[in-house]
């Protein structure tokens, strides 16, 4: 019986040491991949911003040209209304006005089409940016098992200073309180007949949930226990 107990103790310590190494390796992978992804996203967003700036400048130019044509049309109409000369001169002025008006109409059509195209390009770029963000999010969800493990056990710290207790502290909850912990009593580690117990956990966790976590700890091992603990702590107040 004693040998089996020692085997369980050795196994648990080995699991914790392996988990610690996995977390350290996974953290390096996470940092490297996040940095690379951030660089790619930053480069992509800068290209989009540069393209949008160019489109905006072109749009301002087109709008300015349209305003100029409108002012010119207004001046021409006013000049014709004030025209007081011979029929021949009036006819020449009118013919010139009609030619110029037709030319301006065609130019305005071209400018309006250019403006419509620019507005469509703006909308297309905005959609591309949104799709790229969604792609990055989907890619992150498909990342390697190491990153998934680290995210599930995000910020895990293991305190083995007390030989009778193991303290697991989780951080990065994104709230005002930045850490939550659970303490496991391992004083009976070398006795197979005595299951491991949770000595201390956050006050918001119910007794029935504690019992469920202890069952996971004793039946499924320390890694699955820690994953389930973090899920519970995330939900607890």
Curated annotation (Swiss-Prot):
Gene Ontology BP annotations: cell division; chromosome segregation
Keyword Nucleus applies: yes
Compartments reported by the entry: Nucleus; Chromosome, Centromere, Kinetochore
InterPro entries linked to this entry: Spc25_C
A cellular component annotation (GO) from this entry: nucleus
Sections of the chain in a coiled coil: 8-134
Annotated function: Acts as a component of the essential kinetochore-associated NDC80 complex, which is required for chromosome segregation and spindle checkpoint activity.
Species of origin: Candida glabrata (strain ATCC 2001 / BCRC 20586 / JCM 3761 / NBRC 0622 / NRRL Y-65 / CBS 138)
Quaternary organization: Component of the NDC80 complex, which consists of NDC80, NUF2, SPC24 and SPC25.
Protein name (record): Probable kinetochore protein SPC25
Gene name of the record: SPC25
